[in-house]
Amino acid sequence: MESQQLMACAILVIVLVGIFGNSLSFILFSRPHMRSSSVNVLLCALSFFDFSLLTLSIPIFVIPNLDLWANDLSLSTYMAYILKLIYPINLMMQTCSVYIMVMITLERWVAVCRPLQVRVWCTPRKSRNAILVIIVSAFLYNFVRFFEYRFVVTESGALYEKWLRDPGKHRWYYVGYYTILYIVTHFLVPFSVMAFANGHVIVAMCKLSKTRQMLTRQQQREQSTTVMLLIVTFVFAICNTLPFLLNVSESIFPTLFQDESTRGLAYWLNDLSNLLVVLNSGTTFIIYFTFSEKYRQTLVFILKNGCCATVSDYNNYTAMSRTASMRISSETGGQIQRQGSKMSNSSRSSDVLLKPIYMQKRSERFSSEYNERTCKHLAPFEEHKLPKLPSEKRKKKLHKMSAVEHRGMPEITITFSEDLPDGEPDSPCQPC
Protein backbone atom coordinates (compact mmCIF):
# COMPACT_ATOMS: atom_id res chain seq x y z
CA MET A 1 0.00 0.00 0.00
CA GLU A 2 2.90 2.31 0.69
CA SER A 3 4.23 1.86 -2.86
CA GLN A 4 0.82 2.79 -4.27
CA GLN A 5 0.73 5.92 -2.12
CA LEU A 6 4.21 6.92 -3.27
CA MET A 7 3.17 6.38 -6.88
CA ALA A 8 0.02 8.44 -6.28
CA CYS A 9 2.09 11.27 -4.77
CA ALA A 10 4.50 11.19 -7.74
CA ILE A 11 1.56 11.30 -10.16
CA LEU A 12 0.04 14.20 -8.21
CA VAL A 13 3.23 16.27 -8.45
CA ILE A 14 3.50 15.67 -12.21
CA VAL A 15 -0.20 16.45 -12.64
CA LEU A 16 0.05 19.78 -10.82
CA VAL A 17 3.11 20.83 -12.82
CA GLY A 18 1.45 19.67 -16.04
CA ILE A 19 -1.79 21.53 -15.29
CA PHE A 20 0.17 24.75 -14.81
CA GLY A 21 2.25 24.20 -17.96
CA ASN A 22 -0.65 23.21 -20.20
CA SER A 23 -2.83 26.07 -19.00
CA LEU A 24 0.04 28.43 -19.81
CA SER A 25 0.52 26.78 -23.22
CA PHE A 26 -3.20 27.07 -23.95
CA ILE A 27 -3.11 30.79 -23.18
CA LEU A 28 -0.04 31.27 -25.37
CA PHE A 29 -1.27 29.30 -28.37
CA SER A 30 -4.71 30.92 -28.20
CA ARG A 31 -3.28 34.42 -28.66
CA PRO A 32 -4.40 36.12 -31.91
CA HIS A 33 -0.90 36.30 -33.40
CA MET A 34 -0.34 32.60 -32.64
CA ARG A 35 -3.63 31.36 -34.10
CA SER A 36 -2.53 32.42 -37.58
CA SER A 37 -0.52 29.18 -37.92
CA SER A 38 -2.15 25.78 -38.44
CA VAL A 39 0.33 23.97 -36.20
CA ASN A 40 -0.31 26.44 -33.37
CA VAL A 41 -4.05 25.74 -33.62
CA LEU A 42 -3.31 22.03 -33.22
CA LEU A 43 -0.93 22.68 -30.32
CA CYS A 44 -3.59 24.80 -28.64
CA ALA A 45 -6.04 21.89 -28.89
CA LEU A 46 -3.39 19.46 -27.63
CA SER A 47 -2.77 21.69 -24.59
CA PHE A 48 -6.50 21.72 -23.82
CA PHE A 49 -6.85 17.94 -24.09
CA ASP A 50 -3.72 17.33 -22.01
CA PHE A 51 -5.02 19.78 -19.41
CA SER A 52 -8.34 17.90 -19.27
CA LEU A 53 -6.56 14.55 -19.14
CA LEU A 54 -4.39 15.67 -16.22
CA THR A 55 -7.32 17.18 -14.35
CA LEU A 56 -9.33 13.97 -14.64
CA SER A 57 -6.30 11.93 -13.57
CA ILE A 58 -6.55 13.28 -10.01
CA PRO A 59 -9.91 11.63 -9.15
CA ILE A 60 -9.10 8.48 -11.18
CA PHE A 61 -5.46 7.67 -10.38
CA VAL A 62 -4.50 9.75 -7.31
CA ILE A 63 -7.38 9.95 -4.84
CA PRO A 64 -8.24 6.19 -4.76
CA ASN A 65 -4.63 5.32 -3.83
CA LEU A 66 -4.30 7.84 -0.99
CA ASP A 67 -5.01 6.95 2.62
CA LEU A 68 -8.21 9.01 2.81
CA TRP A 69 -10.92 6.37 3.26
CA ALA A 70 -12.48 5.30 6.53
CA ASN A 71 -13.54 1.88 5.19
CA ASP A 72 -13.76 -0.12 1.99
CA LEU A 73 -17.43 0.73 1.44
CA SER A 74 -16.72 4.44 1.04
CA LEU A 75 -13.92 3.67 -1.43
CA SER A 76 -16.20 1.28 -3.35
CA THR A 77 -18.93 3.91 -3.56
CA TYR A 78 -16.44 6.49 -4.83
CA MET A 79 -15.02 4.11 -7.46
CA ALA A 80 -18.53 3.25 -8.67
CA TYR A 81 -19.18 6.86 -9.70
CA ILE A 82 -15.67 7.32 -11.08
CA LEU A 83 -15.79 4.23 -13.33
CA LYS A 84 -19.32 4.93 -14.45
CA LEU A 85 -19.11 8.68 -15.20
CA ILE A 86 -15.54 10.06 -15.13
CA TYR A 87 -13.42 7.30 -16.64
CA PRO A 88 -15.18 7.32 -20.08
CA ILE A 89 -14.57 11.08 -20.37
CA ASN A 90 -10.90 10.49 -19.59
CA LEU A 91 -10.74 7.94 -22.42
CA MET A 92 -12.32 10.48 -24.79
CA MET A 93 -9.60 12.99 -23.94
CA GLN A 94 -6.97 10.31 -24.50
CA THR A 95 -8.36 9.48 -27.96
CA CYS A 96 -8.41 13.16 -28.89
CA SER A 97 -4.82 13.55 -27.70
CA VAL A 98 -3.65 10.59 -29.82
CA TYR A 99 -5.18 11.86 -33.05
CA ILE A 100 -4.14 15.46 -32.46
CA MET A 101 -0.59 14.09 -32.38
CA VAL A 102 -1.29 12.34 -35.69
CA MET A 103 -2.50 15.62 -37.21
CA ILE A 104 0.58 17.47 -35.94
CA THR A 105 2.83 14.83 -37.50
CA LEU A 106 1.02 15.08 -40.84
CA GLU A 107 1.20 18.87 -40.75
CA ARG A 108 4.97 18.73 -40.27
CA TRP A 109 5.28 16.18 -43.06
CA VAL A 110 3.47 18.52 -45.45
CA ALA A 111 5.54 21.52 -44.29
CA VAL A 112 8.87 19.73 -44.83
CA CYS A 113 8.23 17.26 -47.66
CA ARG A 114 5.51 19.15 -49.60
CA PRO A 115 6.34 22.83 -49.07
CA LEU A 116 4.50 24.00 -52.19
CA GLN A 117 1.18 22.59 -50.93
CA VAL A 118 1.52 23.78 -47.34
CA ARG A 119 -0.45 27.01 -47.91
CA VAL A 120 -3.32 25.03 -49.44
CA TRP A 121 -3.45 22.00 -47.17
CA CYS A 122 -2.31 23.45 -43.83
CA THR A 123 -4.52 26.39 -42.89
CA PRO A 124 -5.95 27.38 -39.49
CA ARG A 125 -9.48 26.79 -40.74
CA LYS A 126 -8.72 23.24 -41.87
CA SER A 127 -6.99 22.56 -38.57
CA ARG A 128 -10.09 23.68 -36.67
CA ASN A 129 -12.28 21.47 -38.86
CA ALA A 130 -9.96 18.52 -38.21
CA ILE A 131 -10.15 19.14 -34.45
CA LEU A 132 -13.95 19.19 -34.62
CA VAL A 133 -13.98 15.88 -36.51
CA ILE A 134 -11.61 14.35 -33.94
CA ILE A 135 -13.80 15.47 -31.01
CA VAL A 136 -17.00 14.08 -32.56
CA SER A 137 -15.29 10.81 -33.52
CA ALA A 138 -13.77 10.38 -30.05
CA PHE A 139 -17.16 10.94 -28.42
CA LEU A 140 -18.89 8.40 -30.68
CA TYR A 141 -16.10 5.85 -30.31
CA ASN A 142 -15.96 6.02 -26.50
CA PHE A 143 -19.67 6.53 -25.81
CA VAL A 144 -20.10 2.78 -25.26
CA ARG A 145 -17.62 3.05 -22.37
CA PHE A 146 -20.41 4.45 -20.20
CA PHE A 147 -21.97 0.96 -20.23
CA GLU A 148 -18.91 -1.05 -19.22
CA TYR A 149 -19.97 -0.82 -15.55
CA ARG A 150 -23.35 -0.51 -13.89
CA PHE A 151 -24.58 0.44 -10.45
CA VAL A 152 -25.59 -2.60 -8.44
CA VAL A 153 -25.10 -3.85 -4.90
CA THR A 154 -22.90 -6.95 -5.05
CA GLU A 155 -22.36 -9.66 -2.46
CA SER A 156 -19.10 -8.07 -1.35
CA GLY A 157 -20.87 -4.78 -0.66
CA ALA A 158 -19.62 -2.92 -3.76
CA LEU A 159 -22.02 -0.62 -5.59
CA TYR A 160 -20.85 -1.50 -9.11
CA GLU A 161 -20.00 -4.49 -11.24
CA LYS A 162 -18.63 -5.18 -14.70
CA TRP A 163 -21.23 -5.38 -17.41
CA LEU A 164 -19.91 -5.04 -21.00
CA ARG A 165 -16.39 -5.31 -19.62
CA ASP A 166 -17.10 -8.84 -18.31
CA PRO A 167 -15.52 -11.31 -20.81
CA GLY A 168 -17.74 -14.15 -19.60
CA LYS A 169 -21.04 -12.36 -20.34
CA HIS A 170 -20.07 -10.21 -23.35
CA ARG A 171 -17.24 -11.97 -25.13
CA TRP A 172 -17.86 -10.20 -28.46
CA TYR A 173 -17.44 -6.79 -26.82
CA TYR A 174 -14.30 -7.78 -24.95
CA VAL A 175 -12.59 -9.32 -27.98
CA GLY A 176 -13.97 -7.15 -30.78
CA TYR A 177 -14.16 -3.66 -29.29
CA TYR A 178 -12.02 -3.66 -26.16
CA THR A 179 -9.12 -5.59 -27.71
CA ILE A 180 -9.01 -5.62 -31.53
CA LEU A 181 -10.57 -2.25 -32.25
CA TYR A 182 -8.51 -0.58 -29.53
CA ILE A 183 -5.28 -2.02 -30.97
CA VAL A 184 -6.17 -0.82 -34.47
CA THR A 185 -7.43 2.66 -33.55
CA HIS A 186 -5.05 3.54 -30.72
CA PHE A 187 -1.82 1.84 -31.77
CA LEU A 188 -1.53 0.38 -35.27
CA VAL A 189 -3.06 3.25 -37.27
CA PRO A 190 -1.69 6.27 -35.35
CA PHE A 191 1.77 4.87 -34.69
CA SER A 192 2.16 3.59 -38.26
CA VAL A 193 1.23 7.00 -39.66
CA MET A 194 3.56 8.79 -37.25
CA ALA A 195 6.44 6.39 -37.95
CA PHE A 196 6.04 6.76 -41.74
CA ALA A 197 5.69 10.55 -41.68
CA ASN A 198 8.47 11.11 -39.16
CA GLY A 199 10.80 8.88 -41.17
CA HIS A 200 10.26 11.03 -44.25
CA VAL A 201 10.69 14.21 -42.21
CA ILE A 202 13.98 13.02 -40.69
CA VAL A 203 15.39 12.10 -44.13
CA ALA A 204 14.35 15.48 -45.55
CA MET A 205 15.89 17.34 -42.61
CA CYS A 206 19.17 15.46 -43.00
CA LYS A 207 19.31 16.65 -46.61
CA LEU A 208 18.51 20.22 -45.58
CA SER A 209 21.18 20.21 -42.88
CA LYS A 210 23.86 19.94 -45.59
CA THR A 211 22.68 23.23 -47.09
CA ARG A 212 21.86 24.98 -43.81
CA GLN A 213 23.79 28.13 -44.77
CA MET A 214 21.56 28.58 -47.83
CA LEU A 215 18.33 28.42 -45.81
CA THR A 216 16.34 31.58 -45.16
CA ARG A 217 15.37 32.64 -41.64
CA GLN A 218 11.81 31.41 -42.20
CA GLN A 219 13.07 27.98 -43.30
CA GLN A 220 15.36 27.75 -40.27
CA ARG A 221 12.42 28.61 -38.01
CA GLU A 222 10.32 25.91 -39.65
CA GLN A 223 13.17 23.44 -39.18
CA SER A 224 13.43 24.19 -35.45
CA THR A 225 9.65 23.79 -35.11
CA THR A 226 9.89 20.42 -36.83
CA VAL A 227 12.64 19.28 -34.45
CA MET A 228 10.50 20.33 -31.49
CA LEU A 229 7.46 18.41 -32.72
CA LEU A 230 9.57 15.34 -33.53
CA ILE A 231 10.69 15.23 -29.91
CA VAL A 232 7.07 15.63 -28.74
CA THR A 233 6.07 12.70 -30.98
CA PHE A 234 8.89 10.46 -29.75
CA VAL A 235 8.05 11.17 -26.09
CA PHE A 236 4.41 10.41 -26.86
CA ALA A 237 5.32 7.08 -28.46
CA ILE A 238 7.59 6.03 -25.60
CA CYS A 239 5.12 6.92 -22.86
CA ASN A 240 2.14 5.20 -24.54
CA THR A 241 3.84 1.91 -25.44
CA LEU A 242 3.54 0.33 -21.97
CA PRO A 243 -0.21 1.08 -21.58
CA PHE A 244 -0.79 -0.50 -24.98
CA LEU A 245 1.18 -3.64 -24.09
CA LEU A 246 -0.60 -3.92 -20.75
CA ASN A 247 -3.98 -3.63 -22.43
CA VAL A 248 -3.07 -6.35 -24.93
CA SER A 249 -1.83 -8.59 -22.11
CA GLU A 250 -5.08 -8.11 -20.22
CA SER A 251 -7.07 -9.07 -23.31
CA ILE A 252 -5.00 -12.23 -23.79
CA PHE A 253 -5.03 -13.14 -20.06
CA PRO A 254 -8.39 -11.98 -18.63
CA THR A 255 -7.42 -13.09 -15.11
CA LEU A 256 -4.22 -11.05 -15.07
CA PHE A 257 -5.49 -8.75 -12.28
CA GLN A 258 -7.34 -11.51 -10.36
CA ASP A 259 -4.73 -14.26 -10.23
CA GLU A 260 -2.68 -14.17 -7.02
CA SER A 261 0.56 -15.00 -8.89
CA THR A 262 0.31 -12.08 -11.34
CA ARG A 263 -1.86 -9.64 -9.44
CA GLY A 264 0.96 -7.70 -7.73
CA LEU A 265 3.03 -7.29 -10.90
CA ALA A 266 -0.05 -6.37 -12.94
CA TYR A 267 -1.09 -3.57 -10.57
CA TRP A 268 2.49 -2.28 -10.38
CA LEU A 269 2.73 -2.13 -14.19
CA ASN A 270 -0.69 -0.48 -14.28
CA ASP A 271 0.47 2.27 -11.91
CA LEU A 272 3.66 2.70 -13.95
CA SER A 273 1.70 3.00 -17.20
CA ASN A 274 -0.56 5.63 -15.60
CA LEU A 275 2.55 7.52 -14.49
CA LEU A 276 3.96 7.47 -18.04
CA VAL A 277 0.68 8.72 -19.53
CA VAL A 278 0.58 11.58 -17.03
CA LEU A 279 4.28 12.30 -17.63
CA ASN A 280 3.70 12.61 -21.36
CA SER A 281 0.83 15.06 -20.93
CA GLY A 282 2.58 17.06 -18.22
CA THR A 283 5.97 17.69 -19.83
CA THR A 284 5.11 18.92 -23.33
CA PHE A 285 5.35 22.57 -22.29
CA ILE A 286 8.99 21.99 -21.27
CA ILE A 287 9.75 20.88 -24.83
CA TYR A 288 7.95 23.95 -26.21
CA PHE A 289 9.93 26.27 -23.95
CA THR A 290 13.24 24.61 -24.84
CA PHE A 291 12.93 24.58 -28.63
CA SER A 292 10.51 27.40 -29.57
CA GLU A 293 11.83 30.97 -29.57
CA LYS A 294 8.38 32.40 -30.25
CA TYR A 295 6.95 30.43 -27.30
CA ARG A 296 9.55 31.94 -24.96
CA GLN A 297 9.03 35.43 -26.37
CA THR A 298 5.25 35.24 -25.96
CA LEU A 299 5.62 33.80 -22.46
CA VAL A 300 7.82 36.71 -21.36
CA PHE A 301 5.37 39.17 -22.94
CA ILE A 302 2.39 37.67 -21.08
CA LEU A 303 4.26 37.62 -17.78
CA LYS A 304 5.12 41.31 -18.22
CA ASN A 305 1.85 42.64 -19.66
CA GLY A 306 -0.78 40.12 -18.57
CA CYS A 307 -3.26 38.08 -20.59
CA CYS A 308 -5.39 41.08 -21.63
CA ALA A 309 -2.74 42.73 -23.81
CA THR A 310 -3.67 43.39 -27.43
CA VAL A 311 -2.01 42.32 -30.65
CA SER A 312 -0.62 45.83 -31.22
CA ASP A 313 1.06 45.69 -27.81
CA TYR A 314 2.70 42.41 -28.76
CA ASN A 315 3.83 43.79 -32.13
CA ASN A 316 5.36 46.82 -30.41
CA TYR A 317 7.09 44.55 -27.91
CA THR A 318 8.60 42.33 -30.60
CA ALA A 319 9.64 45.36 -32.65
CA MET A 320 11.42 46.87 -29.64
CA SER A 321 13.12 43.53 -28.95
CA ARG A 322 14.37 43.32 -32.53
CA THR A 323 15.54 46.95 -32.41
CA ALA A 324 17.49 46.32 -29.22
CA SER A 325 19.16 43.26 -30.68
CA MET A 326 20.00 45.13 -33.88
CA ARG A 327 21.46 48.01 -31.83
CA ILE A 328 23.73 45.64 -29.95
CA SER A 329 24.91 43.98 -33.13
CA SER A 330 25.42 47.33 -34.87
CA GLU A 331 27.69 48.57 -32.08
CA THR A 332 29.97 45.59 -32.53
CA GLY A 333 29.88 45.74 -36.29
CA GLY A 334 30.21 49.52 -36.67
CA GLN A 335 33.99 49.53 -36.35
CA ILE A 336 34.31 46.83 -38.97
CA GLN A 337 32.08 48.82 -41.30
CA ARG A 338 34.11 52.01 -40.82
CA GLN A 339 37.36 50.17 -41.45
CA GLY A 340 35.86 48.64 -44.55
CA SER A 341 34.81 52.06 -45.88
CA LYS A 342 38.40 53.32 -45.53
CA MET A 343 39.71 50.42 -47.53
CA SER A 344 36.98 50.60 -50.15
CA ASN A 345 38.55 53.52 -52.05
CA SER A 346 41.89 51.80 -52.44
CA SER A 347 40.36 48.43 -53.15
CA ARG A 348 38.09 49.91 -55.81
CA SER A 349 41.09 50.96 -57.92
CA SER A 350 42.75 47.59 -57.43
CA ASP A 351 39.56 45.85 -58.56
CA VAL A 352 39.77 47.72 -61.84
CA LEU A 353 43.28 46.41 -62.44
CA LEU A 354 42.15 42.86 -61.83
CA LYS A 355 39.60 43.06 -64.65
CA PRO A 356 40.64 42.43 -68.27
CA ILE A 357 40.64 45.43 -70.58
CA TYR A 358 37.65 44.25 -72.60
CA MET A 359 35.55 43.93 -69.39
CA GLN A 360 36.40 47.41 -68.08
CA LYS A 361 34.10 50.32 -68.71
CA ARG A 362 35.66 53.42 -70.22
CA SER A 363 34.78 55.39 -67.08
CA GLU A 364 36.65 52.84 -64.91
CA ARG A 365 39.89 52.99 -66.90
CA PHE A 366 42.73 55.27 -65.86
CA SER A 367 43.12 58.37 -68.04
CA SER A 368 46.84 57.79 -68.63
CA GLU A 369 46.26 54.24 -69.79
CA TYR A 370 43.38 55.41 -72.01
CA ASN A 371 45.51 58.20 -73.56
CA GLU A 372 48.36 55.81 -74.24
CA ARG A 373 46.07 53.46 -76.13
CA THR A 374 44.43 56.23 -78.17
CA CYS A 375 47.64 58.10 -78.99
CA LYS A 376 48.98 55.09 -80.86
CA HIS A 377 46.13 55.35 -83.37
CA LEU A 378 46.08 59.17 -83.58
CA ALA A 379 49.83 59.65 -84.11
CA PRO A 380 49.75 59.34 -87.97
CA PHE A 381 46.99 61.95 -88.19
CA GLU A 382 48.83 64.44 -85.99
CA GLU A 383 51.69 64.66 -88.52
CA HIS A 384 49.40 65.75 -91.39
CA LYS A 385 47.38 68.21 -89.30
CA LEU A 386 47.61 71.85 -90.53
CA PRO A 387 48.76 74.46 -88.00
CA LYS A 388 46.18 76.91 -86.73
CA LEU A 389 46.28 80.56 -87.77
CA PRO A 390 46.87 83.25 -85.09
CA SER A 391 43.43 84.71 -85.77
CA GLU A 392 41.79 81.32 -85.08
CA LYS A 393 43.67 80.99 -81.79
CA ARG A 394 42.61 84.53 -80.81
CA LYS A 395 38.95 83.85 -81.65
CA LYS A 396 39.02 80.65 -79.60
CA LYS A 397 40.54 82.50 -76.64
CA LEU A 398 37.95 85.29 -76.83
CA HIS A 399 35.17 82.71 -77.05
CA LYS A 400 36.39 81.02 -73.87
CA MET A 401 36.60 84.34 -72.02
CA SER A 402 33.09 85.36 -73.07
CA ALA A 403 31.80 81.97 -71.93
CA VAL A 404 33.40 82.45 -68.52
CA GLU A 405 31.93 85.95 -68.20
CA HIS A 406 28.56 84.60 -69.26
CA ARG A 407 28.67 81.95 -66.54
CA GLY A 408 29.94 84.35 -63.88
CA MET A 409 27.55 87.35 -64.33
CA PRO A 410 23.84 86.91 -65.05
CA GLU A 411 22.34 88.95 -67.88
CA ILE A 412 19.73 91.57 -66.88
CA THR A 413 17.16 92.55 -69.49
CA ILE A 414 15.04 95.72 -69.04
CA THR A 415 11.83 96.14 -71.01
CA PHE A 416 9.98 99.48 -71.22
CA SER A 417 6.26 99.79 -71.14
CA GLU A 418 4.64 101.12 -74.30
CA ASP A 419 1.89 103.10 -72.43
CA LEU A 420 4.25 105.82 -71.07
CA PRO A 421 2.85 109.39 -71.59
CA ASP A 422 4.42 111.49 -74.29
CA GLY A 423 6.99 114.00 -73.29
CA GLU A 424 8.37 112.02 -70.36
CA PRO A 425 11.90 110.73 -70.47
CA ASP A 426 12.44 107.10 -71.38
CA SER A 427 13.71 106.15 -67.95
CA PRO A 428 13.08 102.80 -66.35
CA CYS A 429 12.79 104.41 -62.93
CA GLN A 430 9.90 106.80 -62.19
CA PRO A 431 9.65 108.91 -59.05
CA CYS A 432 6.92 107.94 -56.68
Swiss-Prot record:
Belongs to the G-protein coupled receptor 1 family. It is found in: Cell membrane. CDD domains: 7tmA_FMRFamide_R-like (cd14978). The chain crosses the membrane at residues 9-29, 43-63, 85-105, 129-149, 177-197, 226-246, 272-292. It comes from the Eukaryota. The keyword Metal-binding does not apply. Residues 328-349, 388-411 are annotated as: Disordered. This is FMRFamide peptide receptor frpr-18. G-protein coupled receptor for flp-2 neuropeptides. May act through the G(q) alpha type of G proteins. Involved in mediating arousal from the sleep-like state called lethargus, which occurs during molting between larval and adult stages, in part by regulating touch sensitivity, and working in concert with neuropeptide pdf-1. GO terms for molecular function: G protein-coupled receptor activity. Residues 1-8, 64-84, 150-176, 247-271 are extracellular. It is a multi-pass membrane protein. One of its GO terms (biological process) is positive regulation of protein secretion. The gene is frpr-18. Disruption phenotype: Decreased locomotion velocity. Restores normal quiescence during molting between larval and adult stages, in neuropeptide receptor npr-1 mutant background. SUPFAM superfamilies: Family A G protein-coupled receptor-like. The keyword Cell membrane applies. InterPro entries: FMRFamide_rcpt, GPCR_Rhodpsn, GPCR_Rhodpsn_7TM.
